[in-house]
Amino acid sequence: EICNEISADRILDAIQARPACRTAAVVFSGDTGFYSGAKKLNRLIEERAARDYETEFIPGISSLQYFCAKLKLPWEDVKVVSLHGRKGNIAGAVRNHRKVFFLTGGDSAVSGICRTLTENGLAEAVVYVGERLSYPDERIRTGTAASMAEEEFDPLAVLLVENEKVMRRDTVTHGLRDE
């Protein structure tokens, strides 16, 4: 039997409503350790039903991994910012890091992020947008923050921003230099 629930509470309720079911699989997209609903569901199972269930995580590929592979870019030096259901310092992240990956969602849509960058002096930052990644109608677009600010994008999108003009920070120390 297939249940289409997305809330951790409702997923656990659906499992518990079927006591004859000995094995259940809960499928989340992406990597279970990368901003996944698996974390909340596992915590809920531990709180409410630890004696009744044994959990196992089998991760998929995260949107970060997938998108960077499509772009042929390594991601070990990428700053990750989740704006999915939360706020973040968009301009600050881009000013301080050469590459920033944004998980979008809710009020933080791609065009809004690009507008924020443009309004904060980062109009020329290069923006890669991945829409509906891994679906047949997947689309990847590239432009500057300014050129993407008024475009329309699918709500199921991520973006990676490259900023060649990262703020240079000199280390400040107290006292005299060692010479």
Please give the residue ranges for each predicted region.
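Short, acidic/turn-prone active-site loops that include or flank metal/cofactor-
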Residues: 1-11, 61-63, 79-87, 105-107, ...
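Class I S-adenosyl-L-methionine
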Residues: 1-55, 179
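Short amphipathic alpha-helix with an adjacent loop that forms part of the alpha/beta core around
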Residues: 10-19, 90-94, 147-151
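Short, glycine/charged-enriched secondary-structure capping and boundary segments
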Residues: 15-16, 39-43, 70-73, 115-117, ...
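A contiguous loop/helix-start segment that scaffolds small-molecule binding in enzyme catalytic cores
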Residues: 23-24, 96-179
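Class I SAM-dependent methyltransferase SAM-binding "motif I" and its flanking Rossmann-like core
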Residues: 33-98, 150
